[in-house]
Amino acid sequence: MKFFSNFFKNKNNLSSHNVINIFAPISGDIVEIESVPDEVFSNKIVGDGIAISPNSNILLAPINGTIGRIFETLHAFSIKSDDDIELFVHFGIDTVKLKGRGFKKISEENIAVKIGDPIIFIDLPFLKKLVKSTLTPVIISNIDKFKKITKNTGSVIAGKTVIFSVQK
């Protein structure tokens, strides 16, 4: 029954065979990173991962770890996991230009978080009217430290659905 055990893993980053799971930081639909309308993400300049077309209002911790930085404009944050993953979550494209409007910080930098802990509130209807795109890239910036990345597709629930996994 090893096949079915993969569907019922504990809610932590590390599963069997040194595979580390990354969970959805926001609910919505997975989009290929290459489809993000910003070359920094679509060309994988800052790392590899996926994007999510969001349909909810809170960005959650996608891994267990420590919040490294919450950007002053509240549109992005980074987390370093207990498994040495450096993860970057960036809400929308050109959201930095809003200077924090439409966002509210829930958590703080240098705080230990668990999968599903709230980090930033977003006013999705407000932001949809003002930004180029609400696609939310979720990127591993130190992807070169891992052997393999396996990306999932489909609809996701924040804090519950694995969006991709990496193998050490």
Swiss-Prot record:
GO terms for biological process: phosphoenolpyruvate-dependent sugar phosphotransferase system. Zn(2+) binds at residues 75, 90. The modification Phosphohistidine is found at residue 90. The record marks 75 as: Important for phospho-donor activity. Residues 38-142 form the PTS EIIA type-1 domain. PROSITE patterns: PTS_EIIA_TYPE_1 (PS51093). SUPFAM superfamilies: Duplicated hybrid motif. Its cofactor is Zn(2+). One of its GO terms (molecular function) is kinase activity. The active site is at 90 (tele-phosphohistidine intermediate). The EIIA domain is phosphorylated by phospho-HPr on a histidyl residue. Then, it transfers the phosphoryl group to the EIIB domain. The phosphoenolpyruvate-dependent sugar phosphotransferase system (sugar PTS), a major carbohydrate active transport system, catalyzes the phosphorylation of incoming sugar substrates concomitantly with their translocation across the cell membrane. The enzyme II complex composed of PtsG and Crr is involved in glucose transport. This is PTS system glucose-specific EIIA component. It comes from Buchnera aphidicola subsp. Baizongia pistaciae (strain Bp).
